[in-house]
Amino acid sequence: MNNMVSISLCMIVKDEEDTIERCLDSVKELCDEIIIVDTGSTDKTKELARRYTKRLFDFKWVHHFAKARNFAFSKATKDYILWLDADDVILKDDLQKLLLLKQTLDQSVDAVMMPYNLAFDSSGNVTFSSKRHRLVKRSRNFQWIGAVHEYLAVGGKIIRQDAAVTHRSTKTEKSDRNLKIYQQNLKDGKTFSPRDLYYYANECFDHSLYDEAIAHYEKFLKSGLGWSEDCISACDKLAEIFIRKNEQDKAIKAALRSFEYDLPRAEHCCKLGYIYLTQQNIDKAIFWYDLATKLDIQRAENTGGFVQKAYYTWIPHIQLCVCYDRNGNIEKAFEHNEKAREYAPTNPSVLYNKEYFEKRFSKS
């Protein structure tokens, strides 16, 4: 008797001719059903999608991502639903893990949380990731919520799986689509939830509307109703804004404010180290960078928030290299560059430092 679960892939797309085949080729072996919901493509997206599935539906765009995704989910007929964006792929190693999961998944599981790898360094190492409820039981009828930066509201039995979805966008310019949706909602007098406040502030940040971003991050934080990971991220973004505005004291306070919500994260420790280093306060810079080297990335990843892996690996070490070099402790500086080289052996700064130390030591 074959108890292997069946999987529906659900996607919403618009003008994705450059990426949709790459995405579907990477996942077609896993899925028993492919559902594509098109929200108004004017390119060859629909023509390309028809090569993979007959289950292609049109959905009039109403400036609401959750409604489009819920429509796609409503068309699924298999045991579980997998969702992807057209610029996502599943790499071969991750596909093998998911094929095994498909064979062994206990049907009492309601949702599977998986890594979402969003950015990479020049060597292909993951630098920015988060977790997503990526595979969900269809019969639970979980719903998407939110016009923009929508999320899937899940409950019940949730397991973690280390097979990742990889984001591989081909677009170089930041879209202002989400910003315009939020601005129209504001103009229409719609009430923003704490989550809306946070993501609208993020859109303002991404488009360098810093004063507007500050106002909405503050409104979000003062609501006291935000998810702790979003609160931590808001503090980080506030600190970054104040650094860019050359308001260092405010940047320090914003970074420290993140500690109200959880134990320190390496991202914020490195930010504090950076501020103190620019102020030539080397001892304080060393303190914060050193703390970053001692923090557990696994703990951070298990929170479900965004994690910038470089801050848990090579960045604090290369910055400690700079700090100790300025302090005249050449041995310590060399030691930390070697630590950084273990994590990022081809990083240009690491290689430059390696050559620098070789010259220094050859003269002594």
Question: For each predicted feature, which ranges?
Answer:
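Short aromatic/hydrophobic "clamp" motif used to bind/position activated sugar donors
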Residues: 81
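N-proximal low-complexity "stem/linker" segments adjacent to membrane-targeting elements
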Residues: 1-26
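Acidic helix N-cap motif at the loop->helix transition within catalytic regions
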Residues: 18-21, 43-52
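Conserved donor nucleotide-binding strand/loop of the catalytic core
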Residues: 47-71, 75
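A conserved acidic beta->alpha catalytic loop
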Residues: 26, 30, 38-48, 61, ...
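Catalytic-site signature of metal-activated, phosphate-bearing donor transferases
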Residues: 6, 66-73, 84, 90-219, ...
